[in-house]
Amino acid sequence: MADYLGKKVVIIGLGLTGLSCVDFFMARGVIPRVMDTRTAPPGKDKLPDGVECHSGSLNADWLMDADLIVVSPGIALATAVLQAAANAGIEIVGDIELFCREATAPIVAITGSNGKSTVTSLVGEMAKAANWQVGVGGNIGLPALELLKKSCQLYVLELSSFQLETTYSLNATAAAVLNVTEDHMDRYPQGVSQYRAAKLRIYHQAKRCIVNAQDPLTLPEMGMDSRCVSFGVDCGDYQLDSENAFLKVHNQSLLATNEIKLTGRHNYANGLVALALADAVGIPREASLATLTVYPGLDHRFQLARLNKGVRWINDSKATNVGSTMAALDGLNLEGTLYLLLGGDGKSADFSPLKPFLCGNKVQLYCFGRDGKQLAQLRPEIATLTETMEQAIRDIAPRLVAGDMVLLSPACASLDQFRNFEQRGHEFTRLAEELG
């Protein structure tokens, strides 16, 4: 455990995670300074007396005077003043690094462009089914430092590429990179290779590495070694059989896919990697398999919002990048027409990989938001451009017949028109109930 007494600590970024960092240092006899680029940062009113707070910008004087900077994942390390601090030898970490220095129980760590929240919560539920005391958090649910406040036999962390950039002591018992597809290119000017390098940091000092056999970008930099176990829908140590009817481990059939509560090939892949992670930390196999038969998935992840008159309305608002939308469309079989809602802030992504999924005459595109016009160019002859998602849905509703599906899987972030992807999903569900 690290000793911070006497150190000048600056925390960048408030909110729940920033406050958890403040609590962490106060409990160790250190009064940190806090700054946030927002003029009215959330949680400012909850700061303890004596904690100085600078808001509206980064305070370069404070940063250059610090011994330790704890940076929010939302602030790029490439920011000039942070580069200057790093060049001056000032230590820069994130809350996950603080957590890892203190944690004594094994850690399961999960990253990837898509599916990480589902896999993280699924492994957590598998541990609970075995009556383990488990802490689940990180990029989902509770800030990691909050998990230190209760006794745990296991920690399960969802980690973003941004969080991994400032983490050095993870030493996970089991670590997985689910997939790597283009995302956050606004933060990674060198492209996918820079983004991938951040993701692969999760494998550093891991005892077991879970690798996607169908995505070479998830391979550790040094290649496969004895620490590695693979998963994949079509190949791997953990895979589906040729008929997609069973989950198999080392060619032994374990569970029929029709017994799994989650649906879709991408969710079967999530089940496989969760099982591999659970096996790696010794969760009894029967508890893991039982969990797969009852786990319903998370809100806004390919979630059935409404089924009426033979029409399915699917809320996949969490599909905030191209890879996630590709996963939703992969293997989708419909009797009728797919009405696909795309749009929002594309984060400088290349949308062209979606094209192969938009073939045929049984799909209609409805594109909205900041990058709607660019998305409509994927297949202009079947695309309708609207300003908002609501306008698109009101146009779609009268056209629907039994067998059709309305799928919100936008391939974009929501912040151009919504508070977050959850609000976008709730709005879709409200409109589905009103018009469907």
From Swiss-Prot:
<dbReference type="InterPro" id="IPR036565">
    <property type="entry name" value="Mur-like_cat_sf"/>
</dbReference>
<keyword id="KW-0961">Cell wall biogenesis/degradation</keyword>
<keyword id="KW-0132">Cell division</keyword>
<feature type="binding site">
    <location>
        <begin position="112"/>
        <end position="118"/>
    </location>
    <ligand>
        <name>ATP</name>
    </ligand>
</feature>
<protein>
    <recommendedName>
        <fullName>UDP-N-acetylmuramoylalanine--D-glutamate ligase</fullName>
        <ecNumber>6.3.2.9</ecNumber>
    </recommendedName>
</protein>
<dbReference type="GO" id="GO:0008764">
    <property type="term" value="F:UDP-N-acetylmuramoylalanine-D-glutamate ligase activity"/>
</dbReference>
<keyword id="KW-0963">Cytoplasm</keyword>
<dbReference type="GO" id="GO:0008360">
    <property type="term" value="P:regulation of cell shape"/>
</dbReference>
<dbReference type="InterPro" id="IPR036615">
    <property type="entry name" value="Mur_ligase_C_dom_sf"/>
</dbReference>
<dbReference type="Pfam" id="PF08245">
    <property type="entry name" value="Mur_ligase_M"/>
</dbReference>
<dbReference type="Pfam" id="PF02875">
    <property type="entry name" value="Mur_ligase_C"/>
</dbReference>
<comment type="similarity">
    <text>Belongs to the MurCDEF family.</text>
</comment>
<dbReference type="GO" id="GO:0005737">
    <property type="term" value="C:cytoplasm"/>
</dbReference>
<dbReference type="GO" id="GO:0009252">
    <property type="term" value="P:peptidoglycan biosynthetic process"/>
</dbReference>
<keyword id="KW-0547">Nucleotide-binding</keyword>
<keyword id="KW-0436">Ligase</keyword>
<dbReference type="GO" id="GO:0005524">
    <property type="term" value="F:ATP binding"/>
</dbReference>
<keyword id="KW-0131">Cell cycle</keyword>
<dbReference type="Pfam" id="PF21799">
    <property type="entry name" value="MurD-like_N"/>
</dbReference>
<comment type="function">
    <text>Cell wall formation. Catalyzes the addition of glutamate to the nucleotide precursor UDP-N-acetylmuramoyl-L-alanine (UMA).</text>
</comment>
<comment type="pathway">
    <text>Cell wall biogenesis; peptidoglycan biosynthesis.</text>
</comment>
<keyword id="KW-0133">Cell shape</keyword>
<keyword id="KW-0067">ATP-binding</keyword>
<dbReference type="InterPro" id="IPR005762">
    <property type="entry name" value="MurD"/>
</dbReference>
<dbReference type="GO" id="GO:0071555">
    <property type="term" value="P:cell wall organization"/>
</dbReference>
<dbReference type="InterPro" id="IPR004101">
    <property type="entry name" value="Mur_ligase_C"/>
</dbReference>
<dbReference type="GO" id="GO:0051301">
    <property type="term" value="P:cell division"/>
</dbReference>
<keyword id="KW-0573">Peptidoglycan synthesis</keyword>
<dbReference type="InterPro" id="IPR013221">
    <property type="entry name" value="Mur_ligase_cen"/>
</dbReference>
